């Protein structure tokens, strides 16, 4: 071979250009090779229910347009979508030996009469196939604008399908996918199936009955009617939307349910539509007739019914959603809630002249203290939208005071009930039904426990705060048309709280100091109660001192008193004998002094105190922390004249004094010890004359001032943890009326833990999740109660045999599952179905609920939606060809008629055929 010269120039003569369509064809063929669709596809068993899912997606470009290629394959309905069906290909040798050993899968599935209205997949219902490839535009800019473009693409696809020996049907959408205009093709090399759809907007009358559609089907095939032809097999489904008679739901307020957190619908019952899809399974041509004037399709004698109960989401929202709705930002507020409650009431509130808080802080001596109950409150209050008797009952409920006049409360509640029903006149039956419903909605569990599902940081169930939260929430519901009822109740609560404080009456339960596991408002109420307790204790001490001494005997200072005067022993402030004698005066017994209590602290006060301590220098910080010890030293010196530091340690800190060796511990002997310095500086002052460490008057007035100045938003925020806890606990109580599954119990416990975290850390996201959960659970409860009432009323009107309790509960569960599936936006699973036979007891009960016997023949003919499936085994295009099954599915609605054709042909004229 001669060597190529260095400057040799090569000339390229091949200028082949790859078109966009050729590029598309090559890419599409590569996808088919990836799927290995080059042989017969197996027929799936009819014993297993399958559903079509997208198992793979690819993108192909035609010029600047991008097409999405999706593979839809069947998986068992009960399996995980990832567990695809394994398709086993037939051996190639076997196919070549006898082409009819394994039939053309598409032909078998189109002819399958079980592919009727029992299926739920769109392509299976429309065309009768269970596996396909779908070509659709990836966005609106890449749509096929007319059938010519689709025919060009489908022509290329047909060539590829034949050359690759792929039998899987391929569909292509025309224009926008929502129009549902489809063209498709499938072939096994010998016969073909062409798929197409027709969507009609301007409805022609000839397309509106089964008889007309049958003629249209045969005309589309170009078939002449002959007595020798096999009869067409048909199936039909008529959907009837029956409005249920809806009377507005009125809450029936009673004395028994007065203190329960309200539940149930806000105004209307959940369900207002009964949807029945009556199906007649495949029957022969001419066995049933339907035309413009007559129909043999009696809904009560169909093969089976598919039942749904429908409603809008807004009508399903209940009272608890309204109660928790004030904590959502998107909730429209009826009144301004950023104002003080007294300002919201405006002219409806008579302001009370409360004593100035500073006046109570200037008490310097026992002579200025008023002993016993005093300071009767002046007449004041509100005259807002809530009647006085009802307001009094609410306040008594909050403070757990016995209602002295239940008859008056019952009268006010009856007036409230009458006012809500005055707009509509209800019949006696409707009133009875309303009372029955109210009993079910306001179920009260007599065995309800006082414990929580999780450790919420909120008020406990037996506290005033818990009852206040329920009362304020119910005020928003009981008088929803009067938004000022809530601030009115808050103002009345404060007036009663002030009155009880002045009279030193119990305002909250407190056991061992402030309970830091409760919410901030509950801690404030506990602090207020501790202030009342401290005030009572101080008054008892003063009363005791007054009775023990002559009222005219006083220990006044001598006129010659000066700095050198030696104080005489003072016996004031002694509680009891300690049991030991003084160290330096062995003959004198030692007394335990009356001491001050430490100031109880709420969480907010602890945070404020810690912040203040960190701002001080070390000396001032120690001085502040020794405040209580210094008070004890003063009390001890006053009770034990002549006592030394060692005596104080023997009582206050026994571990720092050794009785055997009579020595003080080393830590107390450190030079410049703060304890020693404090002892030397302490004066003998009994506790009655000391400055109060726990200034109950100041703290109580500060709390009451905070309450008085709070805006409605602040009040609601204080109640927030308790309201959410009360809502979740109320749902748990009403769920116990019909029982819940173990799975739901676990979900409830999980939700309770989320709420516990929300109340502890005040996380808005957790509160929103709880609000959504409570709203959903209440919806389900309302639906169940409504269905229970509907079936109970139907039982009273129907003849035996009656549906069993098990059948009714099963029906309620399935109907609720369907309604819930259609409501939640995140429902991705297949819609559940409720199938019954019309003549079964439960079917007859449904018929009574929907009053189906009252449907006229014209109502039956003009159903909300009519669907037909036509199957015809017919020789096409000529009588000499092999008979193949043709299929048409018709979907007739008020605004659109859609026809879907699966047309067979045993002739194949493609030059790529592998005959």
Curated annotation (Swiss-Prot):
Role according to the record: Probable catalytic subunit of a GTPase activating protein that has specificity for Rab3 subfamily. Rab3 proteins are involved in regulated exocytosis of neurotransmitters and hormones. Specifically converts active Rab3-GTP to the inactive form Rab3-GDP.
Single Gene Ontology BP annotation: autophagy
Record PANTHER family: RAB3 GTPASE-ACTIVATING PROTEIN CATALYTIC SUBUNIT
Keyword Cytoplasm: yes
Full protein name: Rab3 GTPase-activating protein catalytic subunit
GO molecular function: GTPase activator activity; small GTPase binding
Disulfide bond annotation, renumbered to this chain: none
Cellular localisation: Cytoplasm
GO CC term (a single one): cytoplasm
Family of this protein: Belongs to the Rab3-GAP catalytic subunit family.
